[in-house]
C-alpha cells in the first residue's frame, strides 16, 4: 500500500493493481489492460508519478497512467520474480529479484534500473550482507536502507559504501529485519524484526547520514489483552482515527476494557520506543 505524489492510494494485490481516486476504486488487471500478471508484490513511484511494480513471475513493470512497460529476464533481469521495489530521488529503480525455484525465501541480490541499464550487487561482488532483501527504503540523503535476510540485520548503502547494523554493533532487536518505514519529519527509520511470534519495532535516528542512536524494544508482548514489558514504560493506546483511548505506565497494562476493533499500542521509555497493532 502506497500513496503517490498526488496522494492517491495504490494497492499491490493478487488481483491486480488497485488505486483510489476521488472516492472511487479502480482496478488494472490482465483482463482490462496490458498488465503482465495480476500478482503484484510491491509498488513505488518515480518523480513523474509513474508506478513501478514488482510482480510474481512476470518481471518489473512500469505504468505511466495509460499502459504498462514490462522488463523481464529477456531485458536483463536476474529473475522474473521481483519482490520489493524502491525508487530513489534520482529515479533509480531498486529491487530484489527472487529465485524462480524458491521465490519466497531466496533472493538474487540488489538490482537497479537506470536509463535503461541494469546493475546487480550480490554478496559475491560487493559488501551486500545477504542476497535476500525483504524491504528497501531511501532516506532524506538518498541512502538506501535494506532489511536483509539470513540474519544479516540492516544495511545502509550510499552508492559506494556499505554499513551493516546488527545486534552486535547496534540496538537492533533481532538480525532478521523484515520491513522498513521512513519518518521524514522526525528523521527516523523504523524497522520491524521477525521474532517468530510477531514483530518488534526499532527506530533509528540519523543526522547527516550518520547513525546517532539505535534503540529497540526487545520485549513487547501482548497476551490475553495485556501489554507485557520487560521494563516499565509509558503505554498509549490509540484508535484508527488517532484518538487517545488509554494512557498508563508500568510493565503489565490491562486492555480488557477496550471495545472490539483495531488499535495501535505505543510504548516508550528512555531506552526504546515500540508500537504494535492489536485487535482485542
Each model region followed by its residue ranges:
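C-terminal outer-membrane/trafficking sorting elements
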Residues: 212-280
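Carboxylate-rich, polar loop motifs that coordinate divalent cations or form catalytic acidic clusters
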Residues: 1-210
Amino acid at each position: 500500500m502506497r500513496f503517490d505524489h498526488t496522494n492517491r492510494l495504490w494497492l499491490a494485490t493478487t488481483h491486480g493493481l488497485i488505486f483510489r481516486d476521488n472516492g472511487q476504486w479502480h482496478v488494472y488487471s490482465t483482463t482490462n489492460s496490458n498488465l503482465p500478471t495480476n500478482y503484484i508484490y510491491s509498488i513505488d513511484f518515480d518523480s513523474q508519478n509513474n508506478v513501478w511494480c514488482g510482480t510474481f513471475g512476470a518481471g518489473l513493470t512500469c505504468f505511466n497512467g495509460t499502459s504498462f512497460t514490462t522488463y523481464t529476464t529477456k531485458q536483463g533481469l536476474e529473475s522474473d520474480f521481483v519482490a520489493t521495489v524502491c525508487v530513489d530521488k534520482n529515479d533509480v529503480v531498486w529491487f530484489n529479484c527472487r529465485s524462480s525455484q524458491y521465490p519466497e525465501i531466496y533472493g538474487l541480490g540488489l538490482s537497479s534500473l537506470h536509463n535503461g541499464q541494469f546493475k546487480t550487487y550480490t554478496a559475491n561482488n560487493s559488501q551486500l550482507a545477504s542476497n535476500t532483501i525483504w524491504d528497501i527504503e531511501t532516506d532524506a540523503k538518498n541512502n538506501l536502507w535494506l532489511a536483509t535476510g539470513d540474519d544479516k540485520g540492516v544495511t545502509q548503502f550510499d552508492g559506494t559504501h556499505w554499513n551493516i547494523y546488527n545486534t552486535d554493533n547496534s540496538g537492533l532487536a533481532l538480525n532478521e529485519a523484515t520491513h522498513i518505514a521512513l519518518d521524514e519529519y522526525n528523521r527516523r527509520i523504523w524497522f520491524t524484526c521477525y521474532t517468530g511470534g510477531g514483530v518488534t519495532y526499532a527506530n533509528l535516528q540519523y543526522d547527516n547520514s550518520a547513525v546517532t542512536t539505535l534503540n529497540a524494544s526487545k520485549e513487547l508482548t501482548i497476551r490475553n489483552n495485556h501489554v507485557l514489558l520487560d521494563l516499565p514504560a509509558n503505554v498509549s493506546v490509540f484508535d484508527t482515527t488517532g484518538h487517545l483511548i488509554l494512557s498508563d505506565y508500568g510493565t503489565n497494562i490491562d486492555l480488557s476494557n477496550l471495545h472490539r476493533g483495531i488499535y495501535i499500542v505505543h510504548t516508550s521509555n528512555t531506552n526504546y520506543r515500540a508500537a504494535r497493532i492489536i485487535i482485542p
